[in-house]
Each structure stands twice: as C-alpha cells, then as structure tokens.
Amino acid sequence: MATITNNPDKEKALNLVLNQIERSFGKGSIMRLGDAARMRVETIPSGALTLDLALGGGLPKGRVIEIYGPESSGKTTLALHAIAEVQKAGGVAAFVDAEHALDPTYSEVLGVDIHNLLVAQPDTGESALEIVDQLVRSAAVDIVVVDSVAALVPRAEIEGEMGDNQVGLQARLMSKALRKIAGNIGKSGCVVIFLNQLRQKIGVTYGSPEVTTGGTALKFYASVRLDIRRIQTLKKGSEGEYGIRAKVKVAKNKVAPPFRIAEFDIIFGKGISQMGCMIDMAEHTDVITRKGAWYSYNGENIAQGRDNAVKYLEENLDVAAIIEKQVREKLDIASLSFAGSGNDDEEEFEAVEAEE
C-alpha cells in the first residue's frame, strides 16, 4: 500500500484508523483512490451511437440520470433502447411506469425483452420511489427507468381534495427519496433513469421560461442530465411523415465533458436508427465520403442519398461492422466497453431550471 505521508508516526496512526473504520463499517468503506482496482466509470450503451460518444462512452453505471424534454421528443424511446441494450448484455431491467402508459408492443419492437422486463405501476409517488430504492439496494437490477417524475404524485395529494393548495409536496418527496437512493446506487452499480417533463414559468421576461418538475433535488443528484428535443420531422414524398430528427444536449455530465450535442433519427414504429447514426459518424470521420448526393466507401459509390445509404448498411451488416470498427479507431474509442459516436457541435441550449 502506498504511503500518504513521509512521517512514519502519522502513517502508522492513519493505517490504524483506516483499519478501525473498515472493521466498523465494512471493507471498502474507505480507501486510497489510487488503490482502487477500477477507477474508470463503467458505462452501458444508450442505444444511439452518436449519443454514446457525446456521453464519453455511454450511460455511466451507478449513477442517477435525468432525461427531460417536451412531449413526443423521444424520452421514453431513448430509455427503452437503453433497457434493450442492458438486456442484450444479459442484464436485468426494471420499468417503474408511474404514468401507466407503457406500450409492450412498441417496447418489443425496440428490442426490449418484455417477458423478462420487471414492470411496476404504483399508485403513489412514495410507493414508486420505495420500489426504486429496494431494487437498487438488491444489487440484482442493472437499470431502473422511472416514467415520469411528473407522475410521482404524493399520497397526501391523492387523498386530498382537488382544490387543496399543497405547495412543495413533490419536491420534498423527491429530495428525501434521492438522499436514500444516492447512498445505495454507487454500491450496486445500477443505472437509475428519471424521465421528466417540462413546464412553463409565468411572467418570465429574460431567460428560458422552461422548468423541469419535481424540484431541484434531481438536478443536483443526477450525474448526467440530457435535454432531448425534436428538431425536424422526417418526410418521404407521398408516404408522408415517417420519423423525427432528435437533438440531445448533454446539459450536465460529472464523468465526461458536458455540453456536447448528439443527433439521431427516430423512425416511427422502429425506434432509433442505428445505421443512420453510423452514416453520420462515418461521414464525420471521413470513413465514408459524400460528393453531392452520392455516398462512397473505399472509393466506390454505395448509395445515392442518405436514406439509400442507410438501407445499404442495413442490407450489408458485414460492411457496417467494418465501418463501425474504423469509426471507433478514428475517434479513439476502441478501448471503451460500449463505444459510440457523437457530434461535437457546440450549439447551446438555454438552461432549464427546476420547478419547486
């Protein structure tokens, strides 16, 4: 064990108190950071390669994550893709459906193993957060998604009258619950994702009027906060709308540089376009080149137009695997367990506050 001080008496006293703390509170309760076997934060894939790179490798394990944005922006879709990725790796996933709006058919299309997905539909916010805490403490679950914070209604509000003015109940509930969850989540390595909605503050002249629900506790306890927005509706000739283009701003990141931007397509009925992410990053790293509407790989034209390029990769998975490997090497992310790719666009979103 490395020494902290050159004074032998101090070192002896320090080792004595460290041993005493470990006897009282358990092995690993205190340690020199340099002695830790694994200091790098492990990650799980988000389901979008562009977002994985923006996050520094993926969603960090043992952390609280908040995904917020307007309605129909892709929050639940992104969370379900993360669940699918965990299940593909042999992990256990849980979905706390406070909104009572989970669609099993759509979840299955995204790759979620609905037969082994743990689902809870609690009636009160207290019940939902207690379920989350127990799942985290079990250390048997790899990811828990709460949909959503706005639907975590305190018991006192449910049992009260519609006209009762109960200020700050949900904020106090979230603050108390997160204090408990945060203490256990690091030990279990579980990823806890809270989906959150946006509200508008009245009378705001300067700055963004948007606020997230549930008070400010989640803002502080979350290691990663993702602001997801719909920026474009995808249309194809006479077929009409077939998807959306989503942009995610990493508004907060304690484990990698924040404020990065990622974009990806969400296809209606299919979810996030993995090959679309691949095309974007391959073009960004010059693995695939584009001249006009033509995309070429290794000097040969492979498709005309982005949609056809995506279709080409979907039909030639062996080529897609080679391109993915080359993209990872170009971005120097080959060593990451769940490597992804992203967009370093520095466009700023306005800061979103939290509603009390």
UniProtKB/Swiss-Prot annotation:
<keyword id="KW-0238">DNA-binding</keyword>
<dbReference type="GO" id="GO:0003697">
    <property type="term" value="F:single-stranded DNA binding"/>
</dbReference>
<keyword id="KW-0742">SOS response</keyword>
<dbReference type="GO" id="GO:0005524">
    <property type="term" value="F:ATP binding"/>
</dbReference>
<comment type="similarity">
    <text>Belongs to the RecA family.</text>
</comment>
<dbReference type="GO" id="GO:0140664">
    <property type="term" value="F:ATP-dependent DNA damage sensor activity"/>
</dbReference>
<dbReference type="InterPro" id="IPR003593">
    <property type="entry name" value="AAA+_ATPase"/>
</dbReference>
<dbReference type="GO" id="GO:0006310">
    <property type="term" value="P:DNA recombination"/>
</dbReference>
<protein>
    <recommendedName>
        <fullName>Protein RecA</fullName>
    </recommendedName>
</protein>
<dbReference type="InterPro" id="IPR020587">
    <property type="entry name" value="RecA_monomer-monomer_interface"/>
</dbReference>
<dbReference type="InterPro" id="IPR013765">
    <property type="entry name" value="DNA_recomb/repair_RecA"/>
</dbReference>
<dbReference type="InterPro" id="IPR049428">
    <property type="entry name" value="RecA-like_N"/>
</dbReference>
<keyword id="KW-0963">Cytoplasm</keyword>
<dbReference type="InterPro" id="IPR020588">
    <property type="entry name" value="RecA_ATP-bd"/>
</dbReference>
<dbReference type="Pfam" id="PF21096">
    <property type="entry name" value="RecA_C"/>
</dbReference>
<dbReference type="InterPro" id="IPR049261">
    <property type="entry name" value="RecA-like_C"/>
</dbReference>
<keyword id="KW-0067">ATP-binding</keyword>
<keyword id="KW-0233">DNA recombination</keyword>
<feature type="binding site">
    <location>
        <begin position="69"/>
        <end position="76"/>
    </location>
    <ligand>
        <name>ATP</name>
    </ligand>
</feature>
<dbReference type="InterPro" id="IPR027417">
    <property type="entry name" value="P-loop_NTPase"/>
</dbReference>
<dbReference type="GO" id="GO:0009432">
    <property type="term" value="P:SOS response"/>
</dbReference>
<dbReference type="GO" id="GO:0016887">
    <property type="term" value="F:ATP hydrolysis activity"/>
</dbReference>
<keyword id="KW-0234">DNA repair</keyword>
<comment type="function">
    <text>Can catalyze the hydrolysis of ATP in the presence of single-stranded DNA, the ATP-dependent uptake of single-stranded DNA by duplex DNA, and the ATP-dependent hybridization of homologous single-stranded DNAs. It interacts with LexA causing its activation and leading to its autocatalytic cleavage.</text>
</comment>
<dbReference type="GO" id="GO:0003684">
    <property type="term" value="F:damaged DNA binding"/>
</dbReference>
<keyword id="KW-0227">DNA damage</keyword>
<dbReference type="InterPro" id="IPR023400">
    <property type="entry name" value="RecA_C_sf"/>
</dbReference>
<dbReference type="GO" id="GO:0005829">
    <property type="term" value="C:cytosol"/>
</dbReference>
<dbReference type="InterPro" id="IPR020584">
    <property type="entry name" value="DNA_recomb/repair_RecA_CS"/>
</dbReference>
<dbReference type="Pfam" id="PF00154">
    <property type="entry name" value="RecA"/>
</dbReference>
<dbReference type="GO" id="GO:0006281">
    <property type="term" value="P:DNA repair"/>
</dbReference>
<keyword id="KW-0547">Nucleotide-binding</keyword>
